[in-house]
């Protein structure tokens, strides 16, 4: 059972505070009113059971249908066969505009409340979106800040970046067969992951940051420098580091450096990784 708050929006559920003068000259302030909804299921479409979103339609008998179901039903109410999809249910729409629900990541620390139906928009940028530990066999999930602390205390492998003039430099050394190298940027409390994908044409190298796409995290670009024993140098500059909640085992389709097999120096791969924080506009 989930409790949600009905609050005023567009003048619907919650009354305005107003000052009213009484007969004796004193002002009386009306208290705001709110209500608690204990069952979110009543805000679901009775046909597809998905969350109702504006516009909401009703037939002549008052049966509800969401905008997605109406064309699928050929505008025929499944409950009474009356036409549906032409009459808006303004009462339900006003309720939807007034319902505030807690973030689904409240147990991780998020205190935000979101208007019903807009949860997914908030979750994409929520600072508390759960991130998965990239260490194989570890099932830990938590906010990106908690994940950093978890990794630092529990695993503590890989090197730590050193920074100069806002740029973090990491000497990344890994076996290609390991496929993944986890690096820490202490100043930002962030984990960056270097991944290798060995293919017939060479080794793909990509870098990602384990964090949500939240403004608080910031944006980063990265550069890779690879030098062979013979002195041949390859460089790659990515305009933006991809932020992920969980590391993928799929070869990247973009933002990668491809090192041909002819330039590899055995099973060990050594690179210089530079991470630069982009200035927010």
Swiss-Prot record:
> Which source organism does the UniProt entry give?
Arabidopsis thaliana
Name the EC number(s): 2.3.2.27
Name this polypeptide is given: Putative E3 ubiquitin-protein ligase SINA-like 6
MF annotations from Gene Ontology: transferase activity; zinc ion binding
What family does this chain come from, according to its entry?
Answer: Belongs to the SINA (Seven in absentia) family.
**Record's superkingdom?**
Eukaryota
Q: Where is this region: SBD?
A: 95-280
Residue ranges of the region described as Disordered = 1-26
Where are the annotated SIAH-type zinc-finger regions?
Answer: 98-156
Quick check: keyword Zinc-finger in the entry?
Answer: yes
Return the SUPFAM superfamilies for the record.
RING/U-box, TRAF domain-like
């Amino acid at each position: 059972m989930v409790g949600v708050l009905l609050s005023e929006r567009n003048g619907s559920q919650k009354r305005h505070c107003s000052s009213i003068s009484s007969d004796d000259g004193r002002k009386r302030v009306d208290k705001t009113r709110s209500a608690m909804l204990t069952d979110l299921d009543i805000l679901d479409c009775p046909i597809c059971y998905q969350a109702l979103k504006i516009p909401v339609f009703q037939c002549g008998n008052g049966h509800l249908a969401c905008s997605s179901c109406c064309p699928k039903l050929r505008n025929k109410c499944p409950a009474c066969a009356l036409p549906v999809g032409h009459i808006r249910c303004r009462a339900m729409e006003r309720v939807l505009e007034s319902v505030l629900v807690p973030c689904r990541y409240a147990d991780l620390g998020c205190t935000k409340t979101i208007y019903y139906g807009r949860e997914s928009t908030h979750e994409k940028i929520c600072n508390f979106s759960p991130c998965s530990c990239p260490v194989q066999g570890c099932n830990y999930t938590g906010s990106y800040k908690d994940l950093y602390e978890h990794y630092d205390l529990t695993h503590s492998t890989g090197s730590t970046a050193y920074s100069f003039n806002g740029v973090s430099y990491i000497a990344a050394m890994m076996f290609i067969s390991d496929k993944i190298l986890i690096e820490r940027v202490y100043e930002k409390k962030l984990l960056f992951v270097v991944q290798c994908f060995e293919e017939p044409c060479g080794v793909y190298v990509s870098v990602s940051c384990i964090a949500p796409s939240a403004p608080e995290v910031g944006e980063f670009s990265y550069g890779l420098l690879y030098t062979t024993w013979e002195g041949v140098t390859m460089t790659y500059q990515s305009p933006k580091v991809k932020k992920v909640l969980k590391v993928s085992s799929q070869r990247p389709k973009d933002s990668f450096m491809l090192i041909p097999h002819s330039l590899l120096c055995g099973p060990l791969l050594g690179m210089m990784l530079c991470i630069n924080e982009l200035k927010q506009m």
